[in-house]
Structures are given as C-alpha cells and as structure tokens.
C-alpha cells in the first residue's frame, strides 16, 4: 500500500515541478490552474496522511520557480511567499477558526479584502523615494532583476511624493488589462507574431524581456498590494488597509476594490459581490484574498513553509478546465462565416456545464495543432463563448483524427470562399443559404436597399421561421391573406404591407445591386457599379479586371462580386427576383446632377439641424462628391454638426477643413 502511495506522491511531485517550471520560468503553462490546484491538493492530502513519505523538496514547500540565468539574481530580504487556498465557504470558515484559536482571543478579527489579480508578482524597491530596483518573486527567496522593464510600466512611479521611508519595498501585481490584451493579440495576429493564451502569460512574458524597449510597448498595469522591507525608523499604521491607502498617497496605484470587514459573513458577502462583478472588471481575477488587517496580529500568527497563517485566497470557480474533443461541427453564421465548433465531453467550467467550444477558424486549428480525440484546455469567461485555448499533447491518445475543413457549406452546399489575408471562411450562397436567410432578407428590405415600408425585423423573422420565404423573391409571392395571419397584423396592415412590397417592383439598378448584399458592396459602390455597367447582365458577366476599372472597386471587392454571381444558387435567386423587379436599363443609376464636386471626398459627423445626414449625403453626391464614413488624409473636408466626436478630433489633427452647417449650405448653393 505504502509503495503505491509513495509512487503516486513521486508522480505528483514530478508533474507539479514541471508545471511550476512552465508557469513561473517559461510563462507558458500547459495545464489550467484548476488542474494544477487539483494535483497540488492531492499531494498535500497524501503528505498529511503519510508524513513519513513527504519529501523535503516537495512542491508544497516551495514558492514559484528559480530565477533564470539571463537575469541578475536578487535576494529578497523579506521572503515573497505564496498563499494557501480555500475553495469553499467551509474551508474559509476553517481558516478563520484557526486564526482565532492561534490568537487565543475573543476580540473581533478584522479582515482586509482584495481581489486576487491573475498576473505576475513583482517587488519594487524605493530608496529616498526613488525607484532603484524591480524584481520578480522567483522562488520566494530570490528573484530576477527586471528594473529596466518595470520602469517602462506607465503607472509605476519612478519617484514617490510626500514623506516616504528611507527604504521602502512595495509588492504588487503586474497585469495586462483585458481590453488591451485583446487589442495586443489582434495586432500580433495581423503581424503573424506570437499571440498569448491569456493576460497572465502576456504580463509575465512582457516583464522578462531582455530588451526593455519591447516591454515598453506592452500595455501593462501595476497594482500595489503589500509592503515588504521598510526602514526600521518608519512609523506606519497598524492596519494593512491603512498602509495601502498610505501607498496611494505616496503615488502608488492601489486597487479601488479593497475594503475591510469584521466577520466571516462579511467576507462571504464580499466574495459573492466580487464574483458577481468578475466579468465587468477590466482585468483577470481568480479569487479574493482575505488578510488579517492588524499588522501586530499578523506578526503573532507568523508563517508556515510557503505561506502566511494570516492570509488565504478564496478561489473562484475555475474558468479553465481539461476535457476531450469528441468531434467538430461547422456552424454557419448570419453573415456566412464558417466557424468550427468542438464537441466536448461535458465539463463544469466556471459553474456552467460546457459541451461545446469554438475553434474560431482554420488558422486557429492549425496554430493549436488540435485533433479530434485530444485532451484540451477549455476557457469560459463571463458571456464569452467557451473556447479551446491549448492542447495537452502529452496526453494525446494514438487514435486521434485530423480536423478537415469543409469545401462546401454544410447548410446549403454552396462553395466556401476564403479571401487571401482573411482568417474567416465564408459560404458564398448568401441569398440562398438558410443560415443567412434572415439577415439577407432584412438587408434586402432595408431603407437604403429596396425600402419596403412596414417590413420590420420581427416580421421577417416570423416569415422565415414559418418557412414562408426562403429567398427575397418569395416576398413578392406573399398574399394578403397569408400576411393577415401573422401576430398583430390584421387585414388592413396586411394590405398595407402587400402594397409596400408591390411598390418596390419598380426600382433602380443601384438599389437592386445594393439589396443583393454582396460582401463589401455598399451603397456608394453599388451606385458606381450601376453607373459603369448600365445593366445587370453586363455586371454579372464582368471579370475581375473589368470590375477594377470602376472607382473604389479593388481586387478584394472584385473577387467578392465575381464569387457572388458565379455561385449557382445566387444566380437562381437573382433570376427569380428579375421576374418581379424592373428598373430603367441603360440609364445613369445615380442622382448626380453636376460634377462640380467631382474628386472631392467629404465625411459627415454630429447632428445637423437643417437637414438629416442622409439628406446632406445625397446633396453632396448629387454634385459629384464622394461621402465616406471615416476620416483620412484623402478627406477633402469634414462636415461637423453638434456633438461631433472623434472624427472631428482626427480631422483637426490632420489639418483638414471643417465645415459647419452654414458653410455646407454655401457649398451646396454655389
């Protein structure tokens, strides 16, 4: 029995030592925190039950990882220890009772409560108010000198203000805010550079760059959470909470969520409140830290091998777990995007049973190297769709299967298109594909397209759900009697809607082209195509080179147009629509009355009082101008109404002309 137990303990030690190295030294953990915590607790339980088998080098006795050779080693004069964990209110209550028993007092113990930030722990040493050293936690006894890197973090003060101790060591966490993390990874993908699995890895990896100029480009943020070394002559409050507020007065950033409570119930209330707001915070947290607030009582309680007796981290339900991929489905979104979705052995992640997770796209499948049958790490945060974040390749069975991306849409069998430079593959059967049907018909009926008055989104959804319309052409086949059976419709409303649909049977070529919903073909491009080709058959027959002769049509837009009209299902729907809809052939499709502003590009922003923005747009286009949606160096002038925002700021920075309504009126009347 003892032999098998001892063997299991050795296995756990080897695994935990390896995972510690991956986490603390390589900044690339291969397993989620929940899996590490599970193994750690198993080893700790076995060591408690079999103390004679416990190794002196056990991971349960250590903190972090050893410093790397490329950084100068720094000794911590006051050890930087870890924290013990509680995974339930019962475990926290047991901790509270241990505190009371050790203090042997009936007085109320006040706790300081703080969010447990999921980043990289660092030490900042100030001498006479000046930052002289930054260091990682390392193994708790010694860390790595990262002074030049921490100096690049924007909210780390290089000089403290006020009457500060001669020597002051501040401990805290460096994180990468969630919004900044998403932007950083997206930019890295565009540059085809390494992306980070999570903000914690990004923060830790950024701090350990040998070139501080790289760290300076990373959006890092520091939060102070405790003191280490302090000059002996310094008089500070006995309260940990008050000391944090003192740090704030000296210019150090402190988390605004900290507070003190006087009971176990107060701690539980704080835990539940932060857990409820977890997904609204702009940084990752994996629990709450409770510390005995009195520094004197902290000293009385002391430490064990790797953690203080006066603090504990109550962990949140894990947002990452391990499970197995049993298969992959390919879903079609409302814009035709094909998304691979992994089917999983059900697993509880963050308190929710997860049986599916997104794999995003073909590039992500290749990057992960994931196969059907793999053991994978699943992450779920808030309302974000669960996703596969990594493959545990040392747990890969022999019978895994490659994931094959389809060539045809799984819904309508139309061709799948992937434009060079884009990660997303799309179904080309826009007007025909059932998965895209609702959005395609809503767009077809919209004001700037066919402008079917009274055909709102809810009615479109009802028509599609009843399977009455499979394509926009079916709108023209609807009877008044059918429409009258819809909820809250009635005979009169049905007649009005039927008449509104019939009224659109005479339109313009430009509106019809725009209504088809071809990717990247907006209102202005549809006008340009109609003006250039004069009739639909010429447009349908056009090849990429001919299309690129049209103003504002580049290679990518041309490819979308060709793909749309070459798709057999789209050809069928267009042919059906032409049975109902007509327009003047061979005429100018736009309402251009003059070329006085030809070659000029305007952008409209803010609220106009004498006309709508659409009316201003039409008036400018009637004089030959182009109206764009964003400001650039090519913009001739910005038309700015009331409450103009970022577009006005950008236009001013580029030195562009700014036109108010009076100037616009003069321009239009000249």
Curated annotation (Swiss-Prot):
Summarize where NAD(+) binds, as residue positions: 33-37, 82-83, 114, 137, 173, 291, 315
Top EC class for this record: ligase
Family, similarity comment: Belongs to the NAD-dependent DNA ligase family. LigA subfamily.
Q: Which positions are annotated as binding Zn(2+)?
A: 409, 412, 427, 433
One biological process GO term for this chain? DNA replication
Q: Which residues form the active site?
A: 116 (n6-amp-lysine intermediate)
InterPro entries cross-referenced by the UniProt entry: BRCT_dom (IPR001357), BRCT_dom_sf (IPR036420), DisA/LigA_HHH (IPR041663), DNA_ligase (IPR001679), DNA_ligase_AS (IPR018239), DNA_ligase_CS (IPR033136), DNAligase_adenylation (IPR013839), DNAligase_N (IPR013840)
Keyword Nucleotidyltransferase annotated: no
Cofactor(s) the protein requires to work: Mg(2+); Mn(2+)
Q: Which UniProt keywords apply?
A: DNA damage, DNA repair, DNA replication, Ligase, Magnesium, Manganese, Metal-binding, NAD, Zinc
What is this enzyme's catalytic activity, as reactions? NAD(+) + (deoxyribonucleotide)n-3'-hydroxyl + 5'-phospho-(deoxyribonucleotide)m = (deoxyribonucleotide)n+m + AMP + beta-nicotinamide D-nucleotide
Question: Which chain positions lie within coiled-coil regions?
Answer: none
Query: SUPFAM superfamilies per the record?
Result: BRCT domain, DNA ligase/mRNA capping enzyme, catalytic domain, Nucleic acid-binding proteins, RuvA domain 2-like
- Enzyme Commission number: 6.5.1.2
Does the record carry Isomerase as a key word? no
Q: What is this protein called?
A: DNA ligase
Mind naming one GO cellular-component term on file for this protein? cytosol
According to its UniProt entry, the function of this protein is described as: DNA ligase that catalyzes the formation of phosphodiester linkages between 5'-phosphoryl and 3'-hydroxyl groups in double-stranded DNA using NAD as a coenzyme and as the energy source for the reaction. It is essential for DNA replication and repair of damaged DNA.
A GO molecular function term, named singly, is:
DNA binding
Q: Gene3D superfamilies recorded for this chain?
A: 5' to 3' exonuclease, C-terminal subdomain, 6.20.10.30, BRCT domain, DNA ligase/mRNA capping enzyme, Helix hairpin bin, Nucleic acid-binding proteins
Q: Which PANTHER family match?
A: CHROMOSOME TRANSMISSION FIDELITY FACTOR 18 (PTHR23389), DNA LIGASE (PTHR23389:SF9)
Q: Where is the BRCT domain?
A: 592-670
């Amino acid at each position: 029995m003892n032999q098998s137990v001892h063997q299991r303990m050795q296995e756990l030690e080897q695994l935990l030592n390896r995972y510690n190295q991956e986490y603390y030294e390589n900044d690339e953990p291969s397993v989620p925190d929940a899996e590490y915590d599970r193994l750690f607790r198993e080893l700790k339980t076995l060591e408690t039950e079999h103390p004679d088998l416990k190794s002196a080098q056990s991971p349960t006795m250590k903190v972090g990882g050893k410093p790397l050779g490329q950084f100068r080693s720094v000794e911590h004069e006051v050890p930087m220890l870890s924290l013990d964990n509680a995974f339930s209110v019962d475990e926290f209550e047991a901790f509270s009772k241990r505190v009371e028993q050790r203090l042997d007092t009936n007085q109320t113990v006040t706790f300081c409560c703080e969010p447990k930030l999921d980043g990289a722990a660092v030490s900042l040493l100030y001498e006479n108010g000046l930052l002289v050293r930054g260091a990682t936690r390392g193994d708790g006894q010694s860390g790595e000198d990262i002074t030049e890197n921490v100096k690049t973090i924007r909210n780390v003060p290089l000089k403290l203000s006020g009457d500060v101790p001669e020597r002051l060591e501040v401990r805290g966490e460096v994180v990468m805010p969630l919004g900044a993390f998403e932007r950083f990874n997206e930019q890295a993908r565009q540059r085809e550079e390494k992306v980070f699995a999570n903000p914690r890895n990004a923060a830790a990896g950024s701090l350990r760059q040998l070139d501080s100029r790289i760290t300076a480009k990373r959006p890092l943020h520091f939060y102070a959470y405790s003191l280490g070394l302090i000059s002996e002559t310094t008089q500070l409050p006995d309260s940990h909470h008050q000391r944090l507020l003192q740090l704030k007065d000296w210019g150090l950033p402190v988390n605004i969520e900290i507070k003190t409570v006087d009971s176990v119930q107060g701690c539980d209330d704080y835990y539940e409140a932060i857990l409820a707001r977890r997904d609204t915070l702009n940084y990752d947290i994996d629990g709450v830290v409770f510390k005995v607030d009195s520094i004197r009582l902290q000293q009385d309680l002391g430490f064990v091998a790797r953690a203080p007796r006066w603090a504990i981290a109550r962990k949140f339900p894990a947002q990452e777990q391990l499970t197995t991929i049993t298969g992959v489905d390919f879903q079609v979104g409302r814009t035709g995007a094909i998304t691979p979705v992994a089917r999983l052995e059900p697993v509880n992640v963050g308190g929710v049973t997860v049986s599916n997770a997104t794999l995003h796209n073909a590039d992500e499948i290749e990057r992960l190297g994931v196969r059907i049958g793999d053991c994978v790490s699943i992450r779920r945060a808030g309302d974000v769709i669960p996703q596969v974040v990594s493959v545990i390749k040392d747990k890969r069975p022999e019978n895994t299967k490659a994931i094959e991306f389809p060539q045809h849409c799984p819904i309508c069998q139309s061709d799948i298109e992937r434009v060079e430079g884009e990660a997303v593959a799309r179904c080309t059967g826009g007007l025909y594909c059932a998965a895209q049907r609702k959005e395609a018909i809503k767009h077809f009926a919209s004001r700037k397209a066919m402008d079917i008055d009274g055909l709102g989104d809810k009615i479109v959804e009802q028509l599609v759900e009843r399977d009455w319309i499979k394509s926009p052409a079916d709108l023209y086949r609807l009877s008044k009697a059918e429409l009258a059976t819809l909820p809250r419709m009635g005979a009169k409303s049905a007649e009005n809607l039927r008449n509104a649909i019939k009224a659109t049977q005479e339109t313009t070529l430009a509106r019809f082209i725009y209504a088809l919903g071809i990717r990247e073909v907006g209102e202005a491009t549809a006008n340009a195509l109609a003006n250039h080709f004069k009739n639909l058959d010429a447009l349908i027959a056009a090849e990429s080179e001919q299309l690129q002769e049209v103003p504002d049509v580049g290679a990518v837009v041309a490819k979308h147009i060709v793909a749309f009209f070459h798709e057999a299902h789209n050809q069928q729907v267009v042919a059906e629509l032409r049975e109902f809809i007509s327009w003047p052939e061979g005429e100018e499709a736009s309402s251009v009355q003059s070329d006085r502003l030809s070659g000029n590009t305007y952008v409209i922003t803010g609220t106009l009082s004498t006309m709508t923005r659409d009316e201003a747009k039409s008036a400018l286009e009637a004089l030959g101008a182009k109206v764009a949606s964003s400001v650039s160096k090519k913009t001739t002038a910005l038309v700015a109404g009331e409450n103009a925002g970022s577009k006005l700021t950008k236009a001013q920075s580029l030195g562009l002309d700014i036109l108010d309504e009076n100037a616009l009126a003069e321009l239009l009347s000249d």
